[in-house]
Amino acid sequence: INYVSKDVDGLHDFYVNILKMDSIAPQQFPRTDATSDSGYDGKIKFATEGSMQMHLAERDLDVAAKNGRHINPVERGHIAFRTDDIEGFKRHLRDHDIPFADYGTAFAAEWYQIFFHDPEGNIIEVHQQVA
């Protein structure tokens, strides 16, 4: 689950101290270096209760425009699912006329990510490990 905030440290402290989740070292999630026209360089912290991860990211309303995409995954947060066949899943979305934003590895060096909306406008990420 990805939540966004203007106060990532405060949000992380809430999940770690109040809900007693464990902090995950950011080194476990290598990031792609952001450039002036690609990627994301906002603050991110991570927490887990053992089977689910929280990715707590700094809100950035310009990410979609900067990356030339129509969906901004750090505008209001999203849920994520893992696949072993990202190309097959993209075909599946196309077959159902569901538009998606293909960010590739722009955000995470080891994860290929796409984002799309459910019927209510909630953002969904599907990703595949690439390294």
Feature-to-residue mapping (PLM):
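Vicinal oxygen chelate
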Residues: I1-K6, G42-G50, K66-A131
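Core segments of cupin and vicinal oxygen chelate
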Residues: N2-M52
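Hydrophobic side chains in well-ordered alpha-helices
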Residues: L11-F14, F89-L93
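A short, acidic/glycine-rich surface segment
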Residues: P30-T35, D62-N67, D102
